[in-house]
Each structure stands twice: as structure tokens, then as C-alpha cells.
Design a protein with these regions (language model features):
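Glycine-rich, flexible loop segments associated with nucleotide phosphate handling
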Residues: 96-100, 168-171, 296
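A structure-centric signal for secondary-structure junctions around beta-strands
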Residues: 18, 30, 240-241, 295
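Local cysteine-cluster metal-coordination motifs and their immediate loop/turn environment
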Residues: 30-38, 254-257, 295-306
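Conserved alpha-helical substructure of the radical SAM core
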Residues: 1-125, 136-148, 152, 161, ...
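Radical SAM enzyme [4Fe-4S]-AdoMet core and its adjacent flexible, acidic
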Residues: 24, 43-48, 83, 114-277, ...
Length: 321
């Protein structure tokens, strides 16, 4: 059966909840981290307007969102109107339990950032800081980052958190190789009031390097990012496990493994429910199930289905020793 017919004939599903929403308020990033697709795609920086952001959020027709992240592959602190963007979130019909910003901590408009924190809408601030805890390795993995900018951000953001948003969690997420790397980072981060989390390398299609040191094995069939909520029987959250990824122009994309592995629709002109039930998403899923190896991005990705997600998925989870 043709994919368009599948989308038309299938019963319309009205989603009530989203488990994780990634919304790139900025398309692109000023860094060229070696394990990231931006290292080869070299995207130009583009920012969503405040009004377009409002339209897109208004078209997300659900009741509740577990976690809303204002990033996917872009750097949110490059937005020139961050505090205005943040102010749009409480206007929505739905409530987000967690609102997260993840940043490379290299460039900040401190006045606007402070105004964003004053609103106490953001509940989690995450800094990416890969390497073994030395300036040399950090800068090698995340060019053209500067170590001193990272340290300045860690210190100044902590002060602003304490002053304006005491409930804000301060977290770092770091790719490390061994326990010694973890300890070196802890010695830097914990005294500054940050909670470190660690993970291994993921195999991200079109990155400059495959940092995993393992041969890529691409599974057949569709992946966890297209799973139905019923496939998450043992998930601890009681709501619907739906995943939504949005680029800064409103385009809905499949995942957080690549900036644009496909296109499902656009929230500037469509409701989320229409995109979820639409022909573009159905066609993409059908192609994954029938000819994944022939797909330009998904044919280079090792993400498997829910319950058997694969090594890259599990390397992204919190690890400690």
C-alpha cells in the first residue's frame, strides 16, 4: 500500500502528551566539534523570530510536555532575543515540567541571559564540555572553543542562578574515556556548584570522525525515534512517550541524531497532530522499514527500535564508576 494511503486510512491519533521536545531556537552552531555533524555540514547561523516561535508552540496541540529542550543541533545562546523567546513558553495551553537549555558556554549576551533566568521558566541549564578535563583536550575536541570561556561561564552562571533562579539545576554533560577523566572533571566542576554527568561517544552520521572506535552496524527497520507510545511498556513516566524535534525554521525533523535526516512538516503552518498523522512521516517510516540501507542518513545510523536501541543510544545515558 502506498504511504499516502497508509496515512489517510490509518485512524487519526490525537496526541495528549509529548515526552521530549527538542526545539532549535538557533539553527547552527559556531563550533565544529569532531563528533558532530556540524563539523562537516558547516551550517550558517539562523535564528527563529519570537513571533514564529510563538506560532510554532501554539501549533503543538497537546496538554503536557515532560521535557522541553531549546536546542537540537544549534547553540541557543546565540539567539539575540533569548529572554523574549523564554517568555513565550508560559503562554502555552500545555505545561512543560522541565525546560532545558544546553550550551557550549562559549558566547553569551550576559544581560539577556540574566533576564532569561529572572523569569524562572528554565529549570535545567546544561553545559557540554567534552574531553579529559584538561584545557588542551577540551579545545582539541571542540574547536574553536576556549577553555577560559568555559570556566568564566561556569562561574558567572552559578552566581546568576543563585541570585535569580535558585531552583535551576546546573548540570554538565561530558564525553569521557575513563574514570580518571571523570575525576578530573569532578575536581573542576563540583566546587563550582555544577553536577557532572558522563557518557560515551555516539556515532552521529556525517560527523568529521566516528569517535566510537567500533564498526558501524546499521539495523534494519525503523528506529526508536519513530516508535509508538505502546512500545514503551516499561517506561517510568506515566504519559505518552512521543518525541518531537523542530528546526529553527519550524521544520519537524525525525530525531536528535542528525539535524535533518528527513522532513515531516512545519509547525509554522501545521498542527503537531497533523504532522504526526501526516503522509510525510508515514512515508519516511515506511522507507525505513523497507529500505533503510538505501537512505542517505538513516543508512549510516546505528539507532535501533525501542527496546533494542543499540550502542550509540546507550552510550548517551548517564554513566559513572
Amino acid at each position: 500500500m502506498h504511504s499516502t494511503q497508509l496515512a489517510v486510512n490509518a485512524p487519526f491519533v490525537q496526541p495528549r502528551q509529548i515526552y521530549c521536545l527538542h526545539f532549535d531556537i538557533v539553527h547552527g552552531c559556531q563550533l565544529r566539534c569532531v563528533g558532530c555533524p556540524n563539523s562537516t555540514l558547516l551550517p550558517k547561523i539562523k535564528r527563529i523570530s519570537v513571533e514564529d516561535f510563538r506560532v510554532c508552540l501554539g501549533n503543538i496541540d497537546v496538554e503536557k510536555i515532560h521535557t522541553m529542550r531549546l536546542f537540537n543541533f544549534g547553540e541557543p545562546l546565540l539567539h539575540k532575543h533569548l529572554s523574549e523567546i523564554i517568555s513565550v513558553i508560559p503562554e502555552q495551553r500545555w505545561k512543560a515540567s522541565i525546560v532545558e537549555i544546553s550550551t557550549n558556554a562559549q558566547r553569551v549576551d550576559w544581560a539577556d541571559f540574566e533576564n532569561a533566568l529572572k523569569q524562572e521558566v528554565v529549570t535545567r541549564l546544561v553545559v557540554s564540555c567534552d574531553g579529559n578535563g584538561t584545557a588542551e583536550e577540551y579545545e582539541r575536541l571542540r574547536p574553536p572553543s576556549k577553555w577560559e570561556h568555559l570556566i568564566e561561564f561556569l562561574d558567572r552562571a552559578r552566581v546568576l542562578r543563585d541570585r535569580w533562579s535558585p531552583g535551576l539545576q546546573l548540570i554538565t554533560k561530558t564525553v569521557v574515556e575513563n574514570a580518571a577523566d571523570m575525576q578530573r572533571w569532578r575536581d573542576i566542576l563540583v566546587p563550582r556548584g555544577w553536577t557532572p554527568e558522563f557518557r560515551g561517544w555516539m556515532a552521529l552520521p556525517e560527523s568529521a570522525q566516528n569517535m566510537t572506535n567500533r564498526r558501524l552496524e546499521v539495523p534494519t527497520g525503523s528506529c526508536v525515534f519513530l516508535a509508538d507510545p505502546k512500545e514503551y511498556d516499561h517506561h517510568p513516566w506515566g504519559g505518552e512517550i512521543r518525541l518531537l524535534y523542530v528546526d529553527a525554521d519550524g521544520t519537524v525533523v525525525p530525531c536528535c541524531i542528525h539535524p535533518r535526516a528527513g522532513v515531516f512538516g512545519n509547525l509554522k503552518t501545521q498542527k503537531y497532530s497533523a504532522i504526526l498523522n501526516g503522509a510525510q512521516r508515514a512515508a519516511f517510516k515506511l522507507q525505513m522499514e523497507s529500505d533503510r540501507s538505501g537512505m542517505s542518513i538513516c543508512g549510516q545510523c546505528d539507532m535501533g527500535p525501542a527496546g533494542n536501541e543499540g550502542p550509540s543510544f546507550h552510550s548517551s545515558m548517564f554513566v559513572d564508576t
